Amino acid sequence: MMTDGYSSKISEIEIANLLSLNPDTDSESRASSSNVQAPKPAAVLVPLIYDPPNAKNPGWQILYTRRTDSVQDHKGQVSFPGGRADPGDNYPTGTALREAYEEIGLRPSDVRILGQMPPFLTITNYLVTPVIGVIPWPYNLTIQPNEVSRVFTIPMDWMAKAENYEIKQRKFPPSAQIPPQFQNIQVIYYRQY
């Protein structure tokens, strides 16, 4: 049990202040200049949970979902609740909150939005904006069984420890029809928690 980690010392206000710094818009400019077809807007909710010092895993934790093996895309992958923007969404926050409600039953009124991270372009031509929000915990989630197989949390302190991850270059074979900006990218691989 880690009680002196960084995540147990940073406050909600400090997280919000970090998110409000000038965002990197480089991914948006790459998206507009590198694709024939405009990227599709999407958003994910990055749900943060704060466990008090007397909890089993004190400090900040991130809530993840694991997709079912029956969904059309990204079968069995670990993800955040989210998806493609719908007309009428207050994009990106409204999209992230709507998707979180649909996938895990997280009511939008229960999420305190702290800010958002810069959008990033995916290999499938989505421009995804991560929206950061704090949720009360414990919370009675209602999992959409057609999309989500499970929900779990991982402490941020664990994720920050270098022995828990490695950074590798991801390379695709020349035969893969991959846009140039994805040919040789750095990927963070975490060991099993």
What are the language-model segments listed below?
Residues 1-80, 84-142, 157, 169-193:
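N-terminal leader/linker segments that precede catalytic domains of diphosphate-processing enzymes
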Residues 145-146:
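Short, conserved loop/helix-junction motifs that constitute active-site signature segments
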Residues 151:
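Amphipathic alpha-helical interface segments
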Residues 154:
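A conserved hydrophobic position in a structured secondary element of the catalytic/binding core
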